[in-house]
UniProtKB/Swiss-Prot annotation:
Stated name of the protein: Probable zinc metalloprotease EGY1, chloroplastic
Naturally occurring in which organism (per UniProt): Oryza sativa subsp. japonica (Rice)
Main localisation: plastid
Compositionally biased intervals (Gly residues): 78-92
Record's subcellular location: Plastid, Chloroplast membrane
Single GO MF annotation: metallopeptidase activity
EC number: 3.4.24.-
Annotated PANTHER family: ZINC METALLOPROTEASE EGY1, ZINC METALLOPROTEASE EGY1, CHLOROPLASTIC-RELATED
Length: 579
């Protein structure tokens, strides 16, 4: 085994560098011209590459460097002999060619025998011994892809990933920023770390020398003067910091990313097409919800024809369906109006802060009419207050309109003058929400609620669906409105803990009842990722914003928790059947 490794090392195989494999090329000297690599070297290199050999960095690189001089001397000596033979005319040239061919054949046979001996030794022992490689001073060779081994293919793959990945920060710009931006009066730099999802940026870690908002504004202005609009500077919490800043609050660091990497891309044509298709599907699902709520008023001729298997004769006139569909449209209009008002709230809050939003992508649902909409940020948020305000504006607007419809609908339901506009719904539906069930019970009374069906106004259905959809979107998870608000108020760590709790409650069916599974799948597929950090990701949102969020989450839980049977029976909400 040692003899085989020594034979392989003594041959003009390859010279390993950090980026590629190449033949050794001796430096030119004025005394003698540098010969080209001999055919023996090329033959051995191709034979070694064909074997698919890989070198272990720990034991192989040092040995290869020690063999470098030996390989170079071997190549120079072989070339010098050929050059000396060339002085004898044509016979000398023929002798040189024959000598090179013989040397190539001998070297190839020598390396081939060494490799075959290594393979047979591997078959007997199962693997190459690293100790024998170390003792002989030659690199250990393995056909297995060990964790610390590398090859030309691996290096090319890394380079390819770097080319396909996001563009990194220029080292020259980093040097200029360190020299001209940071100092003992602003931010004393101690070390640097990678920043960003793929390490495409630079995180400057050090000690702050003043008020963070003032220093951050000063650094942003100096960065624009130095590099223009090439980069974005982020102020984030220092990772793995020990304690808080002496001036109060968390210790901060500054992250640097290219503008085209850190900023969201514009809305594409395909996104507009997808948004239009989803909106049409949402309109259809809202109409279907209205039809389902008015199913009790379907013409009896149509009901008999489609439900009686013994029915004969021509089908009923479909013109009878037109009044039925028209009576179902108010529910559809109400659900769509609530969701559109929700999105208008987001845009009204984003406009004065100069934050761009994407076109909303509505999510259809046949139970509630819609699951809401996905609205993306199309510009970097300046601070956490902006994230909180924009995220909370939509749910507040939608909840205000939904509760108004729900309350007015309950009042109209208890008015005998409008009995012709009421629809019959199963009283079991009021057990789906603790908060809304109690409000309905307090408004309609025990006699109306303690029955198999309850006559309610269509506005109650629209308001109920709107409040439920708003409550789902206010859950503190991912990039939902509630998740964004929680991330702005308490940070990503709190969002991770609340998100895990929310997923658990949805999986157990504690929140949302039968809608917990489809809603949980929707969030996992489309909304699970937290929002990207703001430029100033350290600023405090204030006490009243946190208090408003806590109250909102409490109301969300009351809205999504169903009424359990014992409480529903005691309150008279529906008829509870005991088996």
């Amino acid at each position: 085994m040692a003899a085989a490794a020594a034979a392989l090392a003594s041959s003009p195989m390859v010279h390993l560098t950090a980026s590629r494999l190449r033949l050794p090329r001796p430096a030119r000297s004025p005394a003698a011209a540098t010969p080209s690599p001999s055919p023996a070297s090329a033959a051995c290199c191709s034979r070694g590459a064909a074997c698919g050999l890989e070198w272990r960095p720990k034991s192989g690189l040092r040995a290869l460097r020690r063999c470098e001089d030996r390989l170079r001397c071997f190549s120079i000596d072989g070339g010098g002999g050929g050059g000396g033979g060339g002085g004898g005319g044509t016979g000398g040239e023929d002798g040189e060619k024959r000598g090179e061919e013989e040397a190539a054949a001998a070297a190839e046979a020598k390396v081939g025998g060494a490799v075959e001996e290594m393979r047979s030794e591997r078959t007997r022992s199962g693997s190459f011994s690293s100790s024998s490689s170390s003792s002989s001073g030659t690199p250990g060779i393995s056909n297995e892809p060990p964790f610390l081994s590398f090859s030309v293919d691996n290096i090319d793959t890394v380079k390819l990933l770097e080319l396909l990945g996001p563009e990194k920060v220029d080292s020259a710009d980093v040097k200029a920023i360190k020299e001209k931006l940071f100092g003992y009066t602003t931010f004393w730099l101690t070390r640097e770390e990678p920043f960003g999802d793929l390490g495409e940026g630079v995180l400057f870690i050090g000690n702050l020398r003043g008020k963070r908002e003032e220093i951050f504004a000063k650094l942003q202005q100096q960065l624009r003067e130095l590099t223009g609009d090439k980069y974005n500077l982020f102020m984030v919490e220092e990772p793995n910091s020990e304690g808080e800043d002496p001036r109060g609050g968390p210790r901060v660091s500054f992250g640097l990313l290219r503008r085209e990497v850190s900023e969201p891309g514009p809305t594409t044509l395909w996104q507009y097409v997808i948004s239009l298709l989803l909106f049409l599907l949402t309109v259809f699902s809202c109409v279907e919800l209205g039809i389902a709520s008015k199913i009790s008023s379907l013409p009896p001729e149509i009901v008999t024809y489609f439900t009686d298997p013994n029915a004969t004769g021509p089908p009923p006139d479909m013109q009878l369906l037109l009044p039925f569909v028209e009576s179902a449209l108010p529910v559809a209009y109400g659900v769509l109006a609530i969701q559109l008002f929700h999105e208008v709230g987001h845009f009204l809050a984003a406009f004065p802060k100069k934050v761009k939003l994407s076109i909303p992508f509505f999510i259809p649902n046949f139970t509630l009419g819609t699951f809401g909409a996905i609205t993306q940020f199309k510009s970097i948020l300046p601070d956490k207050k902006t994230m909180f305000d924009i995220s909370m504006a939509g749910p507040l607007a939608g909840a205000a309109l939904s509760f108004s419809m729900f309350s007015v609908g309950l009042l109209l339901s208890s008015n005998p003058a409008g009995a012709s506009d009421l629809v019959e719904v199963p009283s079991k539906l009021f057990q789906g929400s603790l908060l809304l069930g109690l409000v309905s019970r307090a408004t309609l009374g025990y006699r109306a609620m303690h029955a198999a069906t309850v006559a309610i106004h269509p506005l109650v259905i629209a308001g109920w669906c709107g409040l439920t959809t708003t409550a789902f979107n206010m859950l503190p998870v991912g990039c939902l409105d509630g998740g964004r608000a929680l991330q702005g108020a308490f940070g990503k760590d709190a969002l991770f803990g609340f998100g895990l709790t929310t997923y658990s409650l949805l999986g157990l069916g504690v929140l949302g009842g039968p809608l917990s599974l489809p809603w949980g799948l929707y969030v996992l597929i489309c909304q699970r990722t937290p929002e990207k950090p703001c430029l100033n990701d350290v600023s405090d949102v204030g006490t009243w914003r946190r208090a408003a969020l806590i109250v909102s989450v409490f109301l969300v839980v009351l809205t999504l928790i169903p009424l359990w049977d014992e409480l529903a029976e005691d309150l008279g909400v529906g008829l509870v059947t005991s088996f």
